Design a protein with these regions (language model features):
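Conserved HGGG/HGGXW glycine-rich cap/lid loop of the alpha/beta-hydrolase fold
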Residues: 38-94
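Active-site loop/oxyanion-hole signature of alpha/beta-hydrolase fold enzymes
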Residues: 86-127, 131
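Conserved hydrolase catalytic core segment
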Residues: 122-165
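Short beta-strand/loop motif that positions the catalytic acidic residue
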Residues: 262, 268-270
Length: 322
C-alpha cells in the first residue's frame, strides 16, 4: 500500500514537472489602447523566481532578434529573460496608427506586458537598449515601484546632447571628403538616396554601430535591421544617422533633470566607439541614486556583439548582485 502511494506521488510530481517544463514559452499579450486592442509577442527562456529580465529592443521599430546573443550567456547563469516585440514590430500587431507611436503609449504597453507576465519588484529587471533605453528610463520614472532594477544599454539621457555628439564629434572623425558628400545629401534631405545610404553603411556603421565588417554581421542583427518598421522609425527617430532631426518626436527628449528621482539599482552600459557619448553614459550612472557604470572598451552601439565578453561579464555581475 505504501509503495503504491509513493509510486502514485512520484507520478504526479513527474507529470506536473513535465507540464511545467513543456509550457509554451511564447505568450501573445493583449494590449488595450485608445484605438482598440492589439497583440504583442513575447517569449520566455529559463525559470528563476528572483531574476526575470524583460528586454526592450531599439529602433524604434526594430525587433527582438538582435538580442539572441543573450542565449549564449543568460541560460548558463540561470537568468530568466523575455524577448518582446513592441507594438508595430515584426511578430506583434502593426496597427499603422501614428497616434500610438509615442513614449506615453509604449510606457503603458510595457506596464501591461509586465502585468501579463506576472513580473514584480521582487524579480522584474528591465533592460532597454538604444531606444529601448529611453523607454526603460521613462517606464522607471513612472513605475519604478514595480522594478527590481533598470539597465540602460547604449543610450544617453538627452537627445540634444546626442545630436551634438554625433554632429560635432563623430561626424568630424570621418574622412573630410566622405563627410562633405554625406552632408550634401542631408542638406537637401535626400536620406533615401542609395549613395547616401552606402556612404553611411560603409563609413559610419563599421566604426560606431557594430565594429564587425558588414559582410560578417550575424544573421540575427542583419534580420533585425532589415525588418525595422520604418514608419515608426521615421516618426520617432527621423531619417538621419547623425542625430534625431526634423519633426521626429524624440528630438527634444531630455531627462537629465529627472535622473535623481530614480532610487532602484541602475546600470548604465556604454562603449568607447558608440554612437552615444560614453562620458554621458557614465555621468548618468552617477546622477541616479544607486547607479553603476559598465564600460565596453572595444565596443560600439551593438556592444553586446562586438565587445561581448566585457558586456556580458559586467551585465551578469550586476544582475547577480541584486
Amino acid at each position: 500500500m505504501i509503495n503504491k502511494f509513493f509510486l502514485a506521488l512520484i507520478c504526479v510530481i513527474f507529470l506536473n514537472s513535465c507540464e511545467f517544463n513543456n509550457a509554451d514559452p511564447i505568450k501573445i499579450i493583449k494590449i488595450t489602447t485608445e484605438h482598440g486592442d492589439f497583440n504583442v509577442w513575447t517569449k520566455r527562456t529559463g525559470n528563476n523566481p528572483t531574476k526575470k529580465v524583460l528586454l526592450l529592443h531599439g529602433g524604434p521599430g526594430a525587433n527582438h532578434q538582435y538580442f539572441k546573443i543573450f542565449d549564449s550567456y543568460f541560460p548558463n547563469e540561470n537568468i530568466e529573460y523575455y524577448y518582446y516585440d513592441q507594438l508595430g514590430s515584426t511578430l506583434s500587431d502593426n496597427p499603422q496608427i501614428e497616434d500610438l507611436w509615442t513614449i506615453e503609449h509604449y510606457v503603458e504597453e510595457v506596464e501591461q506586458v509586465r502585468k501579463s507576465l506576472g513580473l514584480n519588484k521582487d524579480n522584474f529587471i528591465l533592460l532597454g537598449h538604444s531606444w529601448g533605453g529611453i523607454l526603460g528610463i521613462e517606464y522607471a520614472l513612472k513605475y519604478q515601484k514595480n522594478l527590481k532594477a533598470l539597465i540602460v544599454s547604449n543610450m544617453v539621457p538627452s537627445v540634444p546632447d546626442y545630436n551634438n555628439y554625433a554632429k560635432n564629434v563623430l561626424a568630424l572623425q570621418l574622412d573630410p571628403n566622405i563627410l562633405k558628400e554625406i552632408r550634401s545629401y542631408e542638406a537637401v534631405q535626400d536620406y533615401t538616396n542609395e549613395n547616401y545610404l552606402k556612404l553611411i553603411h560603409d563609413n559610419y556603421y563599421p566604426k560606431h554601430v557594430m565594429r564587425i565588417p558588414a559582410a560578417n554581421w550575424p544573421e540575427d542583427v542583419s534580420n533585425a535591421f532589415a525588418e525595422i518598421n520604418f514608419p515608426i522609425y521615421l516618426k520617432m527617430q527621423g531619417p538621419s544617422e547623425f542625430g534625431i532631426v526634423g519633426d521626429a518626436s524624440l528630438k527634444n527628449w531630455d531627462v537629465t533633470e529627472d535622473l535623481k528621482k530614480l532610487e532602484i539599482p541602475f546600470l548604465s552600459i556604454g562603449a568607447k566607439y558608440d554612437t552615444m557619448d560614453p562620458i554621458q553614459m557614465e555621468w548618468m550612472a552617477n546622477e541616479v541614486q544607486n547607479g553603476f557604470y559598465l564600460n565596453c572598451p572595444n565596443g560600439s552601439h551593438m556592444a553586446m556583439w562586438d565587445d561581448k565578453e566585457n558586456y556580458f561579464a559586467g551585465l551578469i555581475n550586476f544582475i547577480n548582485t541584486l
